[in-house]
């Protein structure tokens, strides 16, 4: 079970975008994740009339390493860590500071 999943609210704790918040759009296999509106890069693309794509400079999100983000606890409005608890035979994710379940 992963500590950070898709649609979790995270905050960047290290790097050029430190302090920015966003939702996890995609979790990649090599401990990286794509966060909406964070770590934006510019890509120069050629037009492709067969696909109907316009050329130009496109801004898109680049992957961040999972160690540079922390899950955001909306109850305390701070970054938090994730732990696991077994309830009714199911493993659930909980915030370390409040021991309350993480709502995705």
Curated annotation (Swiss-Prot):
Keywords for the protein's UniProt record, in alphabetical order: Ribonucleoprotein, Ribosomal protein, RNA-binding, rRNA-binding
Gene3D superfamilies assigned: 2.30.30.30
Taxonomy, superkingdom: Bacteria
Alphabetized InterPro entries for the sequence: KOW, Rib_uL2_dom2, Ribosomal_uL24, Ribosomal_uL24_CS, Ribosomal_uL24_KOW, Translation_prot_SH3-like_sf
GO molecular function, one term: rRNA binding
Residue stretches in coiled coil: none
SMART domains the record matches: KOW (SM00739)
GO biological process: translation
HAMAP family per UniProt: Ribosomal_uL24_B (MF_01326_B)
Family: Belongs to the universal ribosomal protein uL24 family.
Physiological role: One of two assembly initiator proteins, it binds directly to the 5'-end of the 23S rRNA, where it nucleates assembly of the 50S subunit.
Name by which UniProt lists this protein: Large ribosomal subunit protein uL24
Phylogenetic lineage: Bacteria, Pseudomonadati, Pseudomonadota, Gammaproteobacteria, Pseudomonadales
